[in-house]
């Protein structure tokens, strides 16, 4: 990354505007999951300890732009952030008028999406945000794929713009996994539809040694290999795409392995009776909901010997006990591997948590959509703006 880093700058007495991703679930006026708040608090604390006069901004939910909505107020987030930091964090409603924060202090701007023009990357709004600071810090990887006033526009006009500790760590880990990976490199891409992840599959097919596919995506590849998938969810329109990707992987010496055996059931339910079948013998009235024991053993061997693993998506319906075995086997193999592993995406993080391997994954990515776009090789506007700023002010 060619952007400046917050840790390289002198923040003493400076007005520091930090864009964090504090978009967390709120239940009964309380933060229901504070993972993002705790992660952001570390960056905020660093800026405060460096003598910055810190104003934090974030979006929360999807309120109607340009209108105040008490339901989407940052107040519950400010309370939780204050508990973590050990100080009061005031929420400032009219923050665009200017906020007087003492040196080493912090305030939280009310929801940026209450400002008209935020999601449209409005130049006038971006300039007003930039006027509030001496240093703009982009630290929200989860929103870096969106060109909005608080993630992109403000960086164009701020006197100084840099990457915060969270964003820097995220880009470093992704770079390590994708730019110069230790081999063999394995990617796991799960999900219900090939159509939703076709760019990721395309990009990774040409980068990795093995690409393990899971969920409804795997069913489309099983159909492409010429097998019946019974009444499983799959996309007939993408069978040719799957065939092409398998051929392209083989042509470069890699592979997209097809499951040898699968776990099926007649109904999509946690009480359904699960059966194991070879992949060429799936009954017409059953659906594939997980990979079978032979396939798990094969994936286990591949993953334990991997130099790099990129994990995005489960291989079965892991939320239901009869169909959790495949994803559990992946999780345990990744945990046991000496290779560098990175996991991202909501379902993947839920699986990492469920199978208790959080501490054994080398890096857990906080960005859902941004993680996918990075895997696709796309330019993230929030990062590009920092790099352009650094180039213009070098």
From Swiss-Prot:
GO terms for biological process: gluconeogenesis; glycolytic process. Monomer. HAMAP family: Phosphoglyc_kinase. GO terms for molecular function: ADP binding; ATP binding; phosphoglycerate kinase activity. ATP binds at residues 197, 319, 345-348. It comes from the Bacteria. InterPro entries: Phosphoglycerate_kinase, Phosphoglycerate_kinase_CS, Phosphoglycerate_kinase_N, Phosphoglycerate_kinase_sf. This is Phosphoglycerate kinase. Belongs to the phosphoglycerate kinase family. Keywords: ATP-binding, Cytoplasm, Glycolysis, Kinase, Nucleotide-binding, Transferase. It is an enzyme of class 2 (transferase). GO terms for cellular component: cytosol. It catalyses: (2R)-3-phosphoglycerate + ATP = (2R)-3-phospho-glyceroyl phosphate + ADP. Substrate binds at residues 21-23, 36, 59-62, 113, 146. Its EC number is 2.7.2.3. Pathway: Carbohydrate degradation; glycolysis; pyruvate from D-glyceraldehyde 3-phosphate: step 2/5. Transmembrane segments: none annotated. Its main location: cytoplasm. It is found in: Cytoplasm.
């Amino acid at each position: 990354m060619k952007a400046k880093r917050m840790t390289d700058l002198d923040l003493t007495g400076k007005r520091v505007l930090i864009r964090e991703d504090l978009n967390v679930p709120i239940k009964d006026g309380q933060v229901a999951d504070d993972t993002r708040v705790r992660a952001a608090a570390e960056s905020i604390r660093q800026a405060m300890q460096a003598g910055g006069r810190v104003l934090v901004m974030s979006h929360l939910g999807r309120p109607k732009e340009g209108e105040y909505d008490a339901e989407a107020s940052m107040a519950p987030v400010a309370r939780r952030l204050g508990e973590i930091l050990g100080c009061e964090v005031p929420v400032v409603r009219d923050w665009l008028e200017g906020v007087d924060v003492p040196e080493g202090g912090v305030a939280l701007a009310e929801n940026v999406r209450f400002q008209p023009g935020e999601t449209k990357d409005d130049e006038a709004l971006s300039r007003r945000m930039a006027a509030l600071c001496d240093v703009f810090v982009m630290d929200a990887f989860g929103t870096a794929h969106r060109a909005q006033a608080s993630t992109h526009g403000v960086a164009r006009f701020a006197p100084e713009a840099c990457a915060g500790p969270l964003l820097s760590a995220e880009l470093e880990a992704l770079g390590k996994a994708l730019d110069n990976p230790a081999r063999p490199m394995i990617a796991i891409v799960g999900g219900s539809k090939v159509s939703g992840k076709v760019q990721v599959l395309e990009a990774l097919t040409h980068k990795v040694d093995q690409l393990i596919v899971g969920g409804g995506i795997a069913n489309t590849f099983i159909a492409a290999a010429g097998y019946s998938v019974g009444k499983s969810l799959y996309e007939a329109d993408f069978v040719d795409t799957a065939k092409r990707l398998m051929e392209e992987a083989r042509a470069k010496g890699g592979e997209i392995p097809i499951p040898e055996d699968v776990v099926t059931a007649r109904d999509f339910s946690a009480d359904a009776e699960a059966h194991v079948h070879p992949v060429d013998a799936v009954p017409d009235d059953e659906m594939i909901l997980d990979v079978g024991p032979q396939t798990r053993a094969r994936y286990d061997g591949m993953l334990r010997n991997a130099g790099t693993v990129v994990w995005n998506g489960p291989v079965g319906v892991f939320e239901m006990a009869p169909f959790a075995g495949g994803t559990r086997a992946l999780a345990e193999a990744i945990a046991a591997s000496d290779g560098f592993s990175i996991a991202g995406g909501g379902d993947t993080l839920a699986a990492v948590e469920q199978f208790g391997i959080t501490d054994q994954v080398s890096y857990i990515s906080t960005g859902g959509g941004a993680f996918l776009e990075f895997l696709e090789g796309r330019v993230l506007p929030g990062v590009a703006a920092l790099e352009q700023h650094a180039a213009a002010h070098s």
